């Protein structure tokens, strides 16, 4: 509620979530009737970015001070390891010690449908980084990215078919390697390789070729095999993973 509910409750109900009103109290602004009417339903679609999944554990809520932040009010610690020492899925980024959980996109889409009346949704970002230090050949052979994209697209298709979630578009992040805020050029997210010394020098990566086939429909028959390979590769990692 302190993440999505913070803006979705006003947009759909004209008020902040009850838990926020209870915990934050007078520090949380209130909508008057005119404002509530104005903001309710004032969106055309939702653009959702999905990358990783974290566990949440209780954390004492500190008394407000000059260094207090909005996220402190939630009273939780976010972590990639659960109480059994398990990680949610395959490694997302080694340097950040983060992990991804493909099935999480299924739960998030279903949650938004159930909680907020099945709004129109576009997945505006979904992708995985690889080290910027890799040479051209290493960067182009990005089978890890195929694993990531295929597994998430499989669960996205599944939730659309099973739950009727109103997802109308999906954008893989990103079309080409790019400058990342906070990371600069030290990571690569692209389906295409970009030579930073010559921006006209670009090559489609293996993930880009796979994505082309997927969009054109020629990868549908191999999607199950790709997804199986993704699952097997995650299970073969040394770190202990939680059940999917």
Curated annotation (Swiss-Prot):
Positions annotated as glycosylated: 32, 216
Among the Pfam families in the record, one is Glyco_hydro_1
Q: Source species, please?
A: Sinapis alba (White mustard)
Name of the protein in its database record: Myrosinase MB1
Q: Tissue expression, per UniProt?
A: In vacuoles called myrosin grains of a certain class of cells, myrosin cells, distributed in the cotyledons and the axis of the embryo as well as in different organs of the growing plant.
- Cell cycle as a keyword of this entry, yes or no, is no
Q: Name one GO cellular component term.
A: vacuole
Q: Which residues form the active site?
A: 125
EC number(s) given by UniProt: 3.2.1.147
Share what the entry says about its subunit structure, partners included. Homodimer.
User: According to its UniProt record, where is this protein mainly located?
Assistant: other
Substrates-to-products reaction catalysed: a thioglucoside + H2O = a sugar + a thiol
For this protein, the record's SUPFAM superfamilies field holds: (Trans)glycosidases
Family of the protein in this entry: Belongs to the glycosyl hydrolase 1 family.
Q: Where does substrate bind?
A: 51, 173, 180-181
Q: Which terms are listed as keywords in the entry? A: Glycoprotein, Glycosidase, Hydrolase, Vacuole
Q: Which cysteines are disulphide-bonded? A: none
Q: Where in the cell is it found?
A: Vacuole
Q: Which GO terms describe its molecular function?
A: beta-glucosidase activity; thioglucosidase activity
Q: What does this protein do?
A: Degradation of glucosinolates (glucose residue linked by a thioglucoside bound to an amino acid derivative) to glucose, sulfate and any of the products: thiocyanates, isothiocyanates, nitriles, epithionitriles or oxazolidine-2-thiones.
Enzyme class comes to hydrolase
Please, one GO biological process term? carbohydrate metabolic process
């Amino acid at each position: 509620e302190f993440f999505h509910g913070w803006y979705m409750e006003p947009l759909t109900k004209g008020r902040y979530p009850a838990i926020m009103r209870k915990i934050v109290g007078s520090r949380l602004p209130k909508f008057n009737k005119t404002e509530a009417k104005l903001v309710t339903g004032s969106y055309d679609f939702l653009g959702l970015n999905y990358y990783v999944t974290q566990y949440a554990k209780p954390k004492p809520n500190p008394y407000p001070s000059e260094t207090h932040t909005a996220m402190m009010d939630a009273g939780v610690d976010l972590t990639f390891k659960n109480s059994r020492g398990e990680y949610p899925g395959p490694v997302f980024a080694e340097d950040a010690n983060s992990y991804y959980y493909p099935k999480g996109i299924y739960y998030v889409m279903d949650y938004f449908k159930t909680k907020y009346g099945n709004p129109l949704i576009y997945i505006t970002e979904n992708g995985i980084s690889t080290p910027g230090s890799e040479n051209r050949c290493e960067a182009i052979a990005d089978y890890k990215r195929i694993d990531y994209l295929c597994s998430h697209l499989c669960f996205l298709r599944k939730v659309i078919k099973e739950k009727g979630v109103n997802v109308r578009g999906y954008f893989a992040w990103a079309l080409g390697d790019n400058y990342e805020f906070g990371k600069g050029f030290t990571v690569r997210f692209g389906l295409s390789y970009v030579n930073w010394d010559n921006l006209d020098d670009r090559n489609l990566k293996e993930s880009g070729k796979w994505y082309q086939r997927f969009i054109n429909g020629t990868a549908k028959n191999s999607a199950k095999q790709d997804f199986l390979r993704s699952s097997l590769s995650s299970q073969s990692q040394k770190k202990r993973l939680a059940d999917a």
